[in-house]
Amino acid sequence: KYVIVSEAGASIYSTSPIAIEEFPDLAVEKRSAVSIGRRLQDPLAELVKIPPEGIGVGLYQHDVSSKKLKDNLDFVVSKAVNSVGVNVNTASPSLLKYVSGINKRVSDKLIDYREKVGRINSRKEIQSVLSDKVYEQAIGFLRITDGDNVLDSTGIHPESYDVAINLLNSIGMTLSDVGSEKLINKLEEIDTEKYKDLLNTDIYTLEDVISSLK
């Protein structure tokens, strides 16, 4: 089996400061090959490293103001990143900078901590690295897979963990059921108007929790 992956922008990436920092000992051809391979594994994480003018999305893209192109791409990427979240244990600085509340300084601090401890196992652990304000803004978008708490792998903000746990308990489920078809089916049947009062929360938080648990 084989997969065809677009190589647009790979050569531009291979000579960029980011590529040189990531692979200082590799030739540009090998850096391009690595970039193309990574696109198959995680397209979003890799494509954010390429400047908009290097992506090659159309014949007339160079007629558009490069600043407008970059601003619009940044907006779209930021929405995508904050929608799907990022794996805090694998995310590059190029990806982390698109997370709400995180700038280069915060990104570097988080990565330095990650490299120091080897692996981050919980969102609570991140609280010791970020300021309270940044933590509150960013933590819902930072995901931890196979960590101490399964909710850390979802888009549920820690402030709403109690709502999630109480919801699970009220329908006879537990954290170990997260991701199961049985739980998904039960969540589909929930009367949100009834449960928002039962759980003493607002409809928006409840709908967000339900969506994230599916």
Describe every region a protein language model picked out.
Residues 12, 17-22, 80-82, 96, ...:
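A generic, residue-level signal for flexible/boundary positions that often mark functional hotspots
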Residues 42-113:
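Charge-patterned, long linear interaction tracts outside catalytic cores
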Residues 83-214:
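Accessory alpha-helical DNA-binding modules that contact the DNA backbone or grooves
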